[in-house]
């Protein structure tokens, strides 16, 4: 937590976890993204 650079390995898995959360909250983001920006990832 204090030394993210030292825990480079921990940083990678951390990112995956963050992405998972983003995917779950994509529903809410999709509505906001509908303003005129629809990412292809959302389509998939």
From Swiss-Prot:
Keywords of the record: Sporulation
Family: Belongs to the SspN family.
Cited InterPro entries: SASP_SspN
Induction, as annotated: Expressed only in the forespore compartment of sporulating cells.
Keyword Electron transport: no
Domain of life the protein comes from: Bacteria
Region (Disordered): 1-44
GO biological process per UniProt: asexual sporulation; sporulation resulting in formation of a cellular spore
GO cellular component terms, A-Z: endospore-forming forespore
Lineage, uppermost ranks: Bacteria, Bacillati, Bacillota, Bacilli, Bacillales
Protein name: Small, acid-soluble spore protein N
Compartments in which it is found: Spore core
The organism of origin for this protein: Bacillus cytotoxicus (strain DSM 22905 / CIP 110041 / 391-98 / NVH 391-98)
Parts forming coiled coils: none
């Amino acid at each position: 937590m204090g030394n993210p650079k030292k825990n480079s390995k921990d940083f990678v898995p951390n990112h995956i976890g963050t992405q998972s959360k983003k995917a779950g909250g994509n529903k809410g983001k999709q509505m906001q993204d509908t303003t005129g920006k629809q990412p292809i990832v959302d389509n998939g």
